[in-house]
């Protein structure tokens, strides 16, 4: 969807923490294996997208996930929550 792509584009240009996290995880032997964008359950009257980065350990196969929420309601997107661990429900 266009909103999900807007969130990904915004983060790739305006949020260096996604690159910092990828570098930190690489030092721990984790590879970036996926990036997903999903509509947040927190969006009542706002368009909020959660962008989730998944990292997989090269030796053990263990997966760690981190996410950041982006509000896309207005013309200019902005961060709702900073990068934090993500847990599947």
Task: Label each region the model flagged.
Residues 23-43:
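A short, amphipathic edge element
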Residues 44-89:
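Exposed beta-sheet edge and beta->alpha loop/turn motif
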Residues 1-29:
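Core segments of small alpha/beta cavity-forming domains
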Residues 10-11, 35-40, 48-53:
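Amphipathic alpha-helical interface segments used for dimerization/assembly
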């Amino acid at each position: 969807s266009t909103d999900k792509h807007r969130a990904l584009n915004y983060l790739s240009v305006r949020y260096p923490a996604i690159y910092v996290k990828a570098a930190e995880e690489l030092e721990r032997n984790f590879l970036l294996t996926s990036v997903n964008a999903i509509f947040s359950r927190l969006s009542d009257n706002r368009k909020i997208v959660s962008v989730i980065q998944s990292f997989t350990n090269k030796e053990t196969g263990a997966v760690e996930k981190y996410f950041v929420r982006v509000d896309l309601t207005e013309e200019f997107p902005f961060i709702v929550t900073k990068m934090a661990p993500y847990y599947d429900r």
